[in-house]
């Protein structure tokens, strides 16, 4: 069939050949033109979609729905939290300052000075001698017998430590007044009735610290 078509083409007059060639060329140009047109339309459509996506992405937060609002920055949240905490911190500082008003720096200093003298000065030697004589003269108890049988250096240290404990219990470095001491003495009175040695030590501690309370 191809050979028959070729034979017919050879026998065809030259002017018909030209017409057919022109028609074929025109069809090719039209086909190419349609392809370019389709490609141009596709490009325009892509550009339009891209433009719409860009506009949608640049929408300001104020135009977003409430459920799509942008999250608050961490710094903003931290600032808000610090503002909420600030009154509490101020309250704590004021509370500490009010507690400081209940303390007497003068009494604290005098108490620490007295305790230091008991451990390092002649006052401590005089104290342990007095306590030893009073414990020796009192009615014998298991506690008194235990103290009297201690080695002298150990006994002196124990008596000084017990005296310090009573000083800090009765004075406490606060604005201690006589009525405060009386109240604290009443608190420990049942215990002192059972522990006569402790009562003797407490009495000597009070004798040493009375001037601090009366200041």
Curated annotation (Swiss-Prot):
Which region ranges are annotated with the description Disordered? 12-34, 51-71
Q: Where is this region: Involved in self-degradation and in host STAT1 degradation?
A: 15-22
Ranges of Polar residues composition bias in the record: 51-65
UniProt entry keywords in alphabetical sequence: Host cytoplasm, Host-virus interaction, Inhibition of host innate immune response by virus, Inhibition of host interferon signaling pathway by virus, Inhibition of host STAT1 by virus, Inhibition of host STAT2 by virus, Interferon antiviral system evasion, Viral immunoevasion
Mind telling me which InterPro entries this protein's record contains?
Paramyxo_C (IPR002608)
Q: Which coarse location class describes where this protein primarily resides?
A: host cell
Subcellular location per the Swiss-Prot or TrEMBL entry: Host cytoplasm
Name the GO cellular-component terms.
Answer: host cell cytoplasm
- By its UniProt entry, which Pfam families does this protein fall under? Paramyxo_C
PTM annotation: Y1 and Y2 proteins are produced not only by alternative initiation, but also by proteolytic cleavage of C'. Only alternative initiation is detected in vitro, whereas in vivo cleavage seems to be predominant.
**Highest taxon of the source?**
Viruses
Q: What else is known?
A: The C protein is found in virion at a ratio of approximately 40 molecules per virion, presumably associated with the nucleocapsid. The P/V/C gene has two overlapping open reading frames. One encodes the P/V/W proteins and the other the C/Y proteins.
Function, as annotated: The different products prevent the establishment of cellular antiviral state by blocking the interferon-alpha/beta (IFN-alpha/beta) and IFN-gamma signaling pathways. They inhibit IFN-alpha/beta induced tyrosine phosphorylation of STAT1 and STAT2. Blocking the IFN-alpha/beta pathway requires binding to STAT1 in the cytoplasm. They inhibit IFN-gamma induced serine phosphorylation of STAT1. Block the IFN-gamma pathway by binding to and stabilizing the parallel form of the STAT1 dimer, further inducing high-molecular-weight complex formation and inhibition of transcription by IFN-gamma.
Subunit description = The different isoforms interact (via C-terminus) with unphosphorylated and phosphorylated human STAT1 (via N-terminus), favoring the formation of parallel STAT1 homodimers. The different isoforms do not interact with host STAT2. C protein interacts with L protein; this interaction has an inhibitory effect on viral transcription and replication.
Record's protein name: Protein C'
Q: Which organism is it from?
A: Sendai virus (strain Harris)
């Amino acid at each position: 069939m191809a050979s028959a078509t070729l034979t017919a083409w050879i026998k065809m007059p030259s002017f018909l050949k030209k017409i057919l060639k022109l028609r074929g060329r025109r069809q090719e140009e039209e086909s190419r033109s349609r392809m370019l047109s389709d490609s141009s339309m596709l490009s325009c459509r892509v550009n339009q979609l891209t433009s719409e996506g860009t506009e949608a992405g640049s929408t300001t937060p104020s135009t977003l729905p409430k459920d799509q609002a942008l999250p608050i920055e961490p710094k903003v949240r931290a600032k808000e939290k610090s503002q909420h905490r600030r009154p509490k911190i101020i309250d704590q500082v004021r509370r500490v300052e009010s507690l400081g008003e209940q303390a007497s720096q003068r009494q604290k200093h005098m108490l620490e000075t007295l305790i230091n003298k008991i451990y390092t000065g002649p006052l401590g030697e005089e104290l342990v001698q007095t306590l030893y004589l009073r414990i020796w003269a009192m009615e014998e108890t298991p506690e008194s017998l235990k103290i009297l049988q201690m080695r002298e250096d150990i006994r002196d240290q124990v008596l000084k430590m017990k005296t310090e404990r009573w000083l800090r219990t009765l004075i406490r470095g606060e604005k201690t007044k006589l009525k405060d001491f009386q109240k604290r003495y009443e608190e420990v009175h049942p215990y002192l009735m059972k522990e006569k040695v402790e009562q003797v030590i407490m009495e000597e501690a009070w004798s040493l610290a009375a001037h601090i309370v009366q200041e």
